[in-house]
């Protein structure tokens, strides 16, 4: 029986300054209390078995690209992830590259985007604002919204490296 694990690796900044400003203005029309928007890519890596330290370092090197992400203590966090049951073109190419670099234990590499909002003072998003902002942050044809509360994320240690284990939990309709 295979030992398949899905790793969650934080990555680079997802949006340019221009795109961040444009998106922030759209979000501020929904909720004027939002003062800052940061974004970063998250890589989800399906692995069959454990990676050696060398394999893990190679994987990190391959997935190290772009500007360093800005990490702050955000008030609200949203995720846009590929639709369940689909394989994005980015995932196909990234998985090919990883395999060509000799990482045969890696079954698939996928990329999502984490958006972090900072609100003024003690402001909190209302449910209708949260829903409207989630709609702005993802393209429903190829991505679906998520948030930290909609995903189970736990810290773990694997071969001396701190990684996040990511499991998608589906919310059931009543």
For each of these PLM feature ranges, what is it?
Residues 1-174:
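Core nucleic-acid recognition elements
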């Amino acid at each position: 029986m295979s030992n398949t694990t899905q790793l969650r690796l934080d990555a680079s900044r997802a949006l340019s300054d221009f795109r961040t400003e444009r998106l922030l203005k759209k979000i501020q029309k929904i909720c004027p209390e939002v003062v800052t928007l940061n974004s970063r890519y998250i890589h989800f890596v399906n692995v069959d078995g454990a990676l050696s330290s060398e394999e893990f370092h190679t994987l990190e090197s391959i997935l190290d690209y772009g500007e360093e992400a800005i990490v702050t203590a955000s008030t609200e966090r949203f995720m846009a992830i590929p639709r369940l049951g689909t394989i994005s073109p980015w995932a196909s190419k990234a998985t090919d590259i990883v395999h060509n670099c000799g990482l045969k234990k890696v079954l698939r590499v996928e990329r999502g985007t984490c958006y972090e909002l900072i609100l003024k003072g003690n402001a909190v998003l209302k449910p209708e604002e949260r829903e409207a902002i989630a709609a702005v942050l993802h393209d429903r044809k190829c991505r679906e919204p998520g948030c930290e509360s909609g995903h189970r994320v736990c810290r773990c240690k694997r071969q001396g490296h701190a990684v996040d284990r990511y499991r998608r939990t589906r919310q059931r309709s009543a």
